[in-house]
């Protein structure tokens, strides 16, 4: 039976060209360790020129939840980060306060979450184009806002979830995710959404070995634990 919470269009890996770059993390042109988060102002573009950035040795202390101050980059609404490698020494990778654009952003070893998006509103869109992430024991993209996240031609390897609509944020809402041309290997779920809040997921030309690429949850608000209730079917 077709789920009303998601539209899922997945082809088997052998039936299409995997579009996520599978050649590994690019070789950095430079390496910068910073004691504080780098903020990118609203609407501004930060082109790192393929340098690697992190927060210094010991910054990752496991998978405990961090804040934006623990991130390597903090993007204000409409900001763009591009051509960068996030090193393994970080507690949080990139935080977006509102919709943002990430172009060819690579994470060599995710600590807690690679990308956190919050305070985006219905009708606003975040774009994650190219790039990839390795060794994310939990989530790559954590979506706490209420807009749409587009993930295009991204590569994920050894991960828990590529995208997760927040399962227990104190204030819940409908969220949307569009995934196209993504390659996801040796991981768990490509997408996890909350069916009870009306979340939608569209997966197109996803190249993955996941048993269930799209998973439905019953989300909740506040100090609670969301429950898995099924799978998205096309």
Curated annotation (Swiss-Prot):
Cofactor comment in the record? Binds 1 Ca(2+) ion per subunit.
One biological process term in Gene Ontology: pectin catabolic process
Q: Its domain of life?
A: Eukaryota
| Family annotation (InterPro entries) | Pectate_lyase_PlyH/PlyE-like, Pectin_lyas_fold, Pectin_lyase_fold/virulence
Tell me the leader sequence span. 1-17
Tell me one Pfam family matched here: Pectate_lyase
Which UniProt keyword terms apply here?
Answer: Calcium, Carbohydrate metabolism, Cell wall biogenesis/degradation, Glycoprotein, Lyase, Polysaccharide degradation, Secreted, Signal
Can you name a GO cellular component term? extracellular region
Chief subcellular location equals: secreted
One GO MF term on file is: pectate lyase activity
Where in or outside the cell? Answer: Secreted
Cystine links in this protein are: none
What positions does the record give for glycosylation?
168
* CC cofactor: Ca(2+)
* Reported function: Pectinolytic enzyme consist of four classes of enzymes: pectin lyase, polygalacturonase, pectin methylesterase and rhamnogalacturonase. Among pectinolytic enzymes, pectin lyase is the most important in depolymerization of pectin, since it cleaves internal glycosidic bonds of highly methylated pectins. Favors pectate, the anion, over pectin, the methyl ester.
What is the name of the protein in this document?
Answer: Probable pectate lyase F
Its source organism is Aspergillus terreus (strain NIH 2624 / FGSC A1156)
Which lineage is the organism of this entry classified under, starting from the top rank?
Answer: Eukaryota, Fungi, Dikarya, Ascomycota, Pezizomycotina
